[in-house]
UniProtKB/Swiss-Prot annotation:
Protein name: Uncharacterized protein E02H4.4
Gene3D superfamilies, sorted: Spermadhesin, CUB domain
CUB domain: residues covered: 389-517
Covalent S-S links between cysteines: none
Organism: Caenorhabditis elegans
Main subcellular location of this protein, as a coarse class: secreted
GO cellular component assignments: extracellular region
List of glycosylated residues: N30, N142, N295, N342, N362, N410, N503
UniProt KW keywords: Glycoprotein, Secreted, Signal
Subcellular location(s) of the protein: Secreted
Signal peptide span: 1-21
Length: 518
């Protein structure tokens, strides 16, 4: 707590004093408490509104309490480019976790009101970017001064992990030490609900089954695991084996209750000789463990990726993975990875068919390098052929008046000029992927100005859609959630959009249109 008090005292000297002539900031000093008010500047003699760029720091007073529940209403707007920004931490730097444009109402319990800070300290800032007024605007009709008039507040809520008091001057590391040249990133940070499925039927006997088990074990022991349905990091695990009879699978242990050690102790130790039904088993497991908001112990998490990893040392001719399986997985926002082991050429050709909707790989061994061969391209999204996150290039509209692109490929949010996010996000399907690093390039061949409209729902402060001009200067950045979308204009000859996401929460993504202006 003392470190925040020191910061607040320091910032009290740094930030605007709150007075410019007779115009004063509504909150001229930094605040400590459970609620922080947000309102326009005022004239000291009569409290009439005026404009002053204002900023202050709010501290919850408790390391375990962050900030959320923003509500904001506008009584008067002046088209002067007013903007309210809330930053995570004790300075107005970096990307704000919440940004509210002039005239945008924030209602309690939805949209931006739900965004939470990750620290007990936030910075609240108001500024104007337009030419409406430097101090205020004169209303010629009645001779009074008017400017943007707004009022709101943001409150604290429990939920932050307490910050441990350090006994040394060495800063606590934010990431764990890890170095393995086989992996693009540390597998410990993979955040998925993962159902490992092992096919007990194999013509390779115990040697092949043992290798399948080793692949599964070498994979899950790399992960950080949890059983908490409310967590937004780490992976939850389940395990099943394929069997010859309906429902063609056998769940080993509790669904979403396993650790890596549990998987190690429950992999199959013997095989079966009768062929099962892989398609039916996958559909059944999908329905069993990958629905949201049913208030059941088998519920999947709303804001994480989901995957079934099927390990098999044979690929039977009756395993089609056809439209019925594909539609079920799409309906549930679920991904499939098939890891074959020493499959024949004919089996490999059938599994890796060109029209597949799932990820697949044929492994010749069960070493860490073989695990990396499917973790890197699919879990780390670090490859050109990831069917979980297929690329969606810039596309021309049917009438040729604009170009557009989106992510994910099955984006379900608003489109067009007047689109609005209306449906609450249940987290079942239509979500982007972790570890994204995707680029979209638009060539402004006609020259002149273009209007870029963006609808976005991203993890606030962690996942970003950034736009750059031809000189690679950042000209717009989007994160968090915008109910009615945002837009900007640019005349750059080359417009580059880059989308990046971290390893944690995922949401409904974005839709972008680029329209040449007359």
């Amino acid at each position: 707590m003392w470190k925040w008090k020191v910061i607040l005292l320091f910032l009290a000297e740094m930030f605007v004093s709150g007075v410019n002539g007779d115009c004063a900031c509504y909150e001229a000093n930094n605040v400590t408490g459970k609620s922080a008010p947000i309102s326009n500047s005022y004239m000291t003699e009569d409290f009439s509104p005026c404009y002053l760029p204002c900023s202050y720091v709010a501290y919850s007073g408790d390391e375990t309490y962050g900030w959320t529940g923003l509500v904001l209403n506008w009584k008067t707007t002046t088209n002067s480019g007013g903007i309210i920004q809330i930053f995570d931490g004790p300075s107005a730097t970096g990307t704000p976790i919440i940004q509210v444009a002039e005239g945008e109402t924030i209602a309690a319990g939805i949209g931006k009101s739900l965004i939470k800070s990750s620290l007990p300290v936030i910075t609240i800032k108001y500024s104007q970017t337009g030419s409406g007024a430097s101090m205020f605007i004169l209303n010629i009709n009645n001779g009074t001064f008017v400017t943007n008039v707004y009022y709101g507040s943001i409150s604290t809520a429990a939920g932050l992990a307490p910050i441990a008091v350090s006994t040394t001057t060495t800063a606590m590391p934010t990431t764990r030490s890890y170095s393995n040249p086989n992996f693009a990133y540390d597998p410990y940070f993979i955040t998925h609900d993962i159902f490992v499925v092992i096919n007990q039927r194999t013509s390779g006997g115990m040697a092949a089954l043992t290798s399948l088990n080793a692949l599964a074990i070498n994979f899950v022991t790399l992960l950080s695991t949890t059983t908490d349905i409310n967590s937004v990091s780490s992976s939850r695990l389940s395990l099943a084996t394929l069997t010859p009879y309906d429902p063609y699978y056998s769940v080993q242990g509790g669904i979403w209750e396993l650790s890596a050690t549990d998987v190690l102790n429950n992999v199959p130790r013997s095989g079966v000789t009768i062929e099962g039904d892989i398609d039916s088993a996958l559909i059944g497991l999908a329905d069993l463990a990958f629905t949201v908001n049913k208030n059941a112990s088998t519920d999947t998490r709303n804001n994480v990726q989901r995957s079934v990893v099927l390990l098999t040392a044979e690929w039977p001719s009756n395993a089609l993975l056809g439209d019925n399986v594909a539609s079920k997985f799409t309906e549930l926002g679920l991904n499939l990875l098939v890891v074959g082991y020493n499959l024949t050429d004919a089996e490999t050709s059938q599994l890796l068919r060109t029209d597949r909707w799932y990820n697949a790989i044929n492994s010749s061994d069960s070493k860490i390098t073989n695990v990396a061969a499917f973790v890197n391209p699919f879990y780390f999204n670090n490859g050109a052929n990831n069917f979980w996150c297929p690329p969606f290039g810039i596309t021309n509209s049917v009438d040729g008046t604009y170009s557009w692109f989106q992510e994910p490929y099955n984006y379900t949010g608003p489109h067009g000029i007047n689109g609005v996010w209306t449906d609450p996000f249940d987290g079942q399907t239509g979500r982007y992927c972790n570890f994204a690093n995707n680029q979209y390039v638009y060539q402004n061949n006609a020259g002149g100005s273009v209007k870029v409209q963006v609808y976005f729902e991203l993890e606030a402060g962690k996942d970003f859609l950034n736009f750059y001009d031809a000189s690679n200067n950042l000209i717009a950045s989007f994160t968090g959630y915008e109910i009615a979308g945002s837009s900007f204009f640019t005349s750059t000859t080359t417009l580059t959009a880059r989308f990046t996401s971290d390893n944690k929460s995922i949401f409904r993504g974005f839709w972008v249109s680029i329209t040449p202006q007359p």
